[in-house]
A protein has these predicted regions:
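Membrane-helix interface "capping/anchor" motifs
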Residues: 53-67
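Membrane-embedded alpha-helical hairpins and interfacial helices in multi-pass inner-membrane proteins
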Residues: 31-41, 80-90, 100-194
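Alpha-helical transmembrane segments and their membrane-interface exit regions
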Residues: 51, 91-99
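Residue-level recognition of pore/gate-forming positions within transmembrane alpha-helices
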Residues: 23-27, 70-71, 91
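Hydrophobic transmembrane alpha-helices
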Residues: 1-57
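Membrane-helix boundary elements
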Residues: 65-86
């Protein structure tokens, strides 16, 4: 007899897989940028893209990935304790986009390619806003905080592309409760059930 996962077990496995993907990719990307392009003003990060996907799939659980992405970036770049706070806590700014997902928001964002790309960009901008706010609270000059928006510009394009591609794959950029329900309905139809 097949043993099915509970929703909580499925969510735990799903969140863990996305966390591992995020940690490995962010670490490699950060090390590559530091070693191969040390003088570059721009950075690329996968954190916003994966947080946008997890926000769509599980909502506020994406906060775990936001903090993880900041911590991995901090660790790989050899940052200061203050930078850990700025990136770890500041990335939680991505949760500011949660109101966009209420009601029919998830479906509208998921189904419309423009809204999908704009959602990914909104997640990145909210993270940058969070980092800037935390940095300002820690006494960082505002001119330095502007750098959170300018140096991460490529990450915005990257996030829009990654999330748009994820939207083309069945169930990847979709609320998982809805996705599992949809799969269950399809299986019933295929078996000739009600």
């Amino acid at each position: 007899m097949k043993r099915q996962l509970t929703l909580a077990q499925y969510r735990s496995v799903d969140l863990t897989l996305f966390a591992v993907i995020l940690a490995v990719c962010e670490y490699v990307i950060t090390l590559a940028a530091i070693r191969w392009f040390p003088g570059q003003l721009y950075t690329v990060s996968l954190t916003a893209a994966l947080c946008a996907i997890v926000l769509m799939r599980w909502g506020a659980w994406a906060g775990l990935h936001a903090v993880l992405g900041g911590a991995v970036f901090w660790f790989a770049s050899g940052g200061t304790p203050q930078q850990l706070v700025i990136y770890g806590i500041g990335n939680l700014g991505c949760l500011l986009v949660l109101p966009l997902l209420r009601g029919n928001g998830k479906e509208k964002i998921r189904r419309d390619k423009l809204f999908t790309a704009l959602f990914a960009l909104a997640v990145l901008l909210a993270m940058q806003l969070g980092r800037a706010a935390v940095a300002l609270l820690l006494g960082t000059p505002w001119q330095t905080c502007v750098g959170f928006f300018t140096t991460d510009a490529l990450s915005g394009v990257f996030a829009m592309v990654v999330v748009s591609l994820a939207g083309r794959l069945d169930g990847v950029f979709e609320d998982q409760k809805r996705y599992l329900h949809r799969l269950q309905e399809q299986q019933k139809k295929e078996k000739g059930g009600f």
